[in-house]
Amino acid sequence: MKNCYIRISAFFVHLENFRREEKEAVMAKTYDFSELAQALVDKTVTKEELLNRVKSDFGLIPLLLTGVGSSKAAVRYGCSKLLIDLSEEYPEKLYPHFGSFIDLLDSKYRIVTWNALAIIANLTRVDADKRFDAIFGKYFSFLNSDYMVTVANVVGYSGTIALAKPYLIPRITDELLKVEDVSITQHLTEECKRVIAQQTIKTLGLFFDRIDQKERVLSFVRACLDSPRTKLRTTAEAFLEKWG
């Protein structure tokens, strides 16, 4: 019985070693797009493993960009999420592909657009050529979206952009204060507007000390003190306690 147990244990150890070696072999190989896509669909490689693979070979970034255009959701969103992670840690590696991320803003998939908004904001930290400045209007045009998540994403990422490009703070502030005039739609209710206002106050708080239009901002925040949304009221109160 003891020998049987030892043999079974040895089998599972061997099986685990085989699986580990198989994964290592997958990660060590040079992908083409079809192999990358299939690996994500079949889950023979995790997103974390693939991320580490790309970190060791940034030449794989074009494959991820191709993957974002895939008709398969697992590939599309898997590659898109990896690009966000890379933009946070290695914006300089993605910066040469800035134009590709601008194109993704017009994706028919909202999640891809949201991810592109995040990536572009992260790339402003290394935007020596002021490529973002050229698309400022396009980026902030998404504040006019019919969808709350799209508007909220622009508001949230505006803080990253403002800190990376402080000379744009006056323009960014002007854009953020326009959320008061966001239109109600099927996908953006009055309560959604309150959520957006709450996020706007948080974002403005990241760089309020650098804002010239302080009284306009304070007026916007004070108007939120009577909101029926508790979290918005408390956010406004905390802002005014610090800055008002």
Task: List the model feature ranges, each with a label.
Residues 50, 79, 116, 154, ...:
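Conserved hydrophobic register position within alpha-solenoid helical repeats
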Residues 76-86, 114-122:
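Non-membrane alpha-helical segments in proteins
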Residues 28-34, 55-68, 91-104, 129-142, ...:
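Amphipathic alpha-helical scaffolding segments comprising HEAT/armadillo-like alpha-solenoid repeats
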Residues 71-73, 108-110, 146-147, 193, ...:
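Short inter-helical turns and helix N-cap capping residues of alpha-solenoid HEAT/ARM repeat scaffolds
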Residues 161, 179-235:
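Extended alpha-helical scaffolding segments
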Residues 27-78, 85-86, 204, 230-244:
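N-terminal alpha-helical scaffold/docking segments in eukaryotic complex subunits
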Residues 84-85, 121, 159-160, 198-201, ...:
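Structural signature of alpha-helical solenoid repeat scaffolds
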